[in-house]
């Protein structure tokens, strides 16, 4: 992965202009053998100030706001007592919720200043293995925490959980993990009606 020349500057200016607790920009997926599509700029694109609830809603619906840490600049105080889970995949998921919950407001810009290089051997692209269920467990905990702390976002949280379960489920293509496949399919059946048409 790599960043644009304006990566930190844009995040810092957005945070300062908004008086926010953290700022977030966007990333571009760059595939092997393909050129970068976006053009870096120091102009803040589509600058927005988001409330805590609106920010969480965007994260849950994956509307331009992701759980990934590299596209964000946080005030250090948000991380007091928060640690990334050791030895787990997709460790950004639980941390993103905890720090967003503590923020009063966030700044968002559409600048694509982080370039996420896609290799066939990356965690996201590698064949299914049971360690990928860390993602499902994190998203289930996220859903339960949102239901407790922000009940008005319960259905959005269910939608995010369902999306994650489907993502992992569709990666299973062998009989070796049939038991896991069936368990994930039960989760899809449990949440699909409640999650679809949530807006």
Predicted regions and their residues:
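Amphipathic alpha-helical repeat scaffolds of TPR domains
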Residues: 159-170
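Secondary-structure edge/capping motif, primarily at the C-terminal ends of alpha-helices
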Residues: 1, 120, 146-150, 169-176
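Donor-binding/catalytic cores of nucleotide-activated saccharide
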Residues: 2-107, 117-130
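Non-membrane alpha-helical structural segments and their capping/turn regions in soluble enzymes
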Residues: 5, 129-137, 178, 182-185
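C-terminal, non-catalytic tails of nucleotide-sugar-dependent glycosyltransferases
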Residues: 137-156, 193-198
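Membrane-interface aromatic/basic loop that binds lipid-linked glycans or pyrophosphate carriers
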Residues: 20, 174-199
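Glycine- and acidic-residue-rich phosphate-binding/metal-coordinating active-site segment common to enzymes
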Residues: 112-146
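Residues within HEAT/ARM-like alpha-solenoid scaffolds
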Residues: 134, 152-160, 179
């Amino acid at each position: 992965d790599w960043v644009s020349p304006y990566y930190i500057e844009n995040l810092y200016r957005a945070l300062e202009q908004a008086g926010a607790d953290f700022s977030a920009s966007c990333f571009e997926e760059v595939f092997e053998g393909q050129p970068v599509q976006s053009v870096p700029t120091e102009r803040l694109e589509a600058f927005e100030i988001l409330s805590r609830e609106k920010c969480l809603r965007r994260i849950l619906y994956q509307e331009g706001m992701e759980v990934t840490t590299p596209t964000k600049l946080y005030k250090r105080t948000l991380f007091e007592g928060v640690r990334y889970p050791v030895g787990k995949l997709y460790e950004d998921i639980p941390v993103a919720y905890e720090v967003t919950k503590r923020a009063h407001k966030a700044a968002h810009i559409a600048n694509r200043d982080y370039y996420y290089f896609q290799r066939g051997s990356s965690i996201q692209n590698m064949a299914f293995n049971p360690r990928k269920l860390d993602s499902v467990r994190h998203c289930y905990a996220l859903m339960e925490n949102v239901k407790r702390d922000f009940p008005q976002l319960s259905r959005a949280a269910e939608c995010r959980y369902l999306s994650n379960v489907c993502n992992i489920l569709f990666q299973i293509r062998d009989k070796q993990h049939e038991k896991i496949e069936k368990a994930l399919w039960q989760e899809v059946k449990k949440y699909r009606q409640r999650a679809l048409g949530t807006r």
